[in-house]
Structure formats: structure tokens, C-alpha cells
Amino acid sequence: MVRLSAFADEVSVVFDEQLKYLNEAGIKWMEIRFVDGKNITALSDEEVMEVKAKLRKASIGVSAIASPIGKYAIDAPFEDHMNLFRRTIRTAQMLDAGMIRIFSFYGSDDTDIENCQEEVIRRLQAFSEEVKGTGICLVHENE
């Protein structure tokens, strides 16, 4: 089954307007990224539950969490990033999202990403291990 899904935050920063647009366009799924200007990964559990209620009322499902995971320099501290990833998994579970979009890091002024293949793979494997057993699929977007 094909699911047509959209980044509704490209239509409006206001979440209610995003849902209205999706319904008017006949799109029943969204890749959720920003809610009222705030990244979905930064929302509290209470805020996520408010989002879920609005989604349910609008009959819109979440196909994926469009996260910023991996969209950081490879030399940034990994533990903070892993904590954000764990939060993203929780958010995906709360919203019944089957996928989390991730990236595969980039270099910095001091670090050429081409020389960091082993570290990139180590980090992606850590994400993969963390999501095991959750039913969530990680989907990679090239930067």
C-alpha cells in the first residue's frame, strides 16, 4: 500500500493550519518535523499528547518523525545526540510513527567526513541497536 505523506510545515508554521491543509488536500499522512515552530524532537510528553489528540481529531497519521538525528558534525559529542535519539524513539512510539528519518553526519572545519567512515558506521550501528525491538524503521536521507 502506498501512503502519500507530506511535510506540512512547509505550508505553515502553525500546526492547526498544517492539519487543515492536509485535510483540504486529501493527504492523510504527514512526516512531522515542526509543530508551531518547535522541532518535534523538542516537545515534552505532554505536548506530544496534545499533538496526538489534534492528529486524531483531524484523522491524520504520522508516517515518520522527520528528525535532525545525524544532521550534526561528526566531531560533536555523541552521548547528547544519542539522548536526543532516545527521545525521538519515544516520540515516534507516542505518535504511532513507523519510521524515523536520520542523516549520516557531516564533517566540520577541522574534520573531513571522508576520513570518518568507521565513526559514521559506529554511530549508525548504535542508532540501529537502540531501535531494535521497537517496530520502528530508520530511514536515511542524504544531506
Residue ranges and their predicted role:
Residues 3-5, 29-31, 59-66, 97-101, ...:
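Structural preference for beta-strand elements that scaffold enzyme active sites
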Residues 31-56, 104-111:
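Glycine-rich, proline-tolerant flexible connector loops at the mouths of alpha/beta enzymes
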Residues 7-11, 33-35, 65-70, 105-107, ...:
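Active-site beta-loop-alpha junctions enriched in small/polar residues
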Residues 1-15:
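Boundary/entry segment of secreted carbohydrate-active catalytic domains
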Residues 15-35, 95-96:
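Catalytic domains of carbohydrate-active enzymes, especially glycoside hydrolases
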Residues 38-41, 71-75:
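Short active-site-adjacent helix-start/loop capping segments
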Residues 17-20, 54-57, 73-143:
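Active-site acidic/histidine proton-transfer and metal-coordination neighborhood
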Residues 8, 40-41, 78, 117:
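A generic secondary-structure micro-motif detector
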